[in-house]
């Protein structure tokens, strides 16, 4: 190739001073590869990699889970079943110790591994709720309801709506809710009273709280 004056431009030679050095003799390359292999072998066997996610405390036993949860986890491969079960127990321990953020990390990892298991989504909803992550909790509780048809989470769904600043929507969620479980009924009344108070309906909120207290007393007798 020539420049404007017709002088030739020669391609630079490939040599030690350039990026592409001269090829090494075959024997030398072979010896270097053998040395590298020997060095790798001298390192010994690799240690097994640690599982992703938060470290599970010592002593956690998935057998502590409710039998219904254990039954759900049987749909998973055995190694994953044990890991997810331990994560759920660790989350429960963390909540008992008022370590809500740690509990959330455990259930987040459980959801990553087994997001199609209803009890896992339920656990993640509860830990999200305990961390005031109401939008996330709402999404999880709705997913559980779609998966199982279980309405027992309705009071928590309504309370999430309250947490998001939507008391009227919370009241709509509770409208027509008639749980058979007295404890869930009381929870719904308390959440409804809070929503009434948020909406400025303080007298109605007080009446609902009195009713909840009376119901609680009757249950204790």
Regions found by a protein language model. Give the residues of each.
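Basic Arg/Gly/Lys-rich low-complexity intrinsically disordered segments
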Residues: 1-74, 78, 85
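Solenoid-like repeat scaffolds
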Residues: 74-79, 108-115, 142-149, 176-184, ...
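Alpha-helical segment of the N-proximal tetratricopeptide repeat
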Residues: 75-112, 123
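Structural register within alpha-helical repeat arrays
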Residues: 90, 123-124, 157, 192, ...
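Residue-level signature for tetratricopeptide repeat
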Residues: 93, 127, 158-160, 195
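Structural motif corresponding to the intra-repeat A-B loop/turn of tetratricopeptide repeats
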Residues: 97-98, 131, 164, 199
């Amino acid at each position: 190739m020539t420049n404007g004056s017709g002088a030739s431009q020669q391609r630079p030679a490939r040599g030690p001073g350039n990026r592409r050095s001269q090829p090494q003799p075959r024997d030398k390359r072979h010896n270097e590869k053998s040395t590298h292999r020997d060095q790798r072998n001298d390192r010994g066997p690799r240690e097994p990699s640690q599982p992703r996610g938060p470290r599970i405390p010592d002593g956690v036993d998935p057998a502590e889970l409710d039998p219904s949860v254990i039954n759900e986890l049987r749909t998973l491969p055995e190694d994953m079943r044990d890991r997810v079960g331990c994560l759920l127990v660790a989350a429960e321990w963390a909540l008992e110790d008022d370590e809500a953020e740690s509990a959330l990390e455990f259930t987040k990892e459980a959801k990553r591994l087994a997001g199609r298991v209803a009890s896992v989504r339920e656990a993640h909803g509860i830990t999200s709720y305990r961390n005031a992550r109401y939008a996330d909790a709402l999404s999880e509780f709705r997913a559980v309801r779609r998966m199982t048809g279980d309405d027992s989470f309705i009071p928590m769904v309504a309370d999430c709506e309250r947490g998001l600043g939507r008391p009227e929507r919370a009241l709509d969620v509770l409208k027509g809710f008639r749980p058979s479980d007295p404890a869930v009924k009381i929870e719904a009344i308390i959440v409804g009273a809070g929503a009434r108070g948020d909406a400025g309906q303080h007298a109605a909120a007080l009446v609902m709280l009195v009713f909840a207290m009376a119901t609680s007393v009757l249950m204790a007798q």
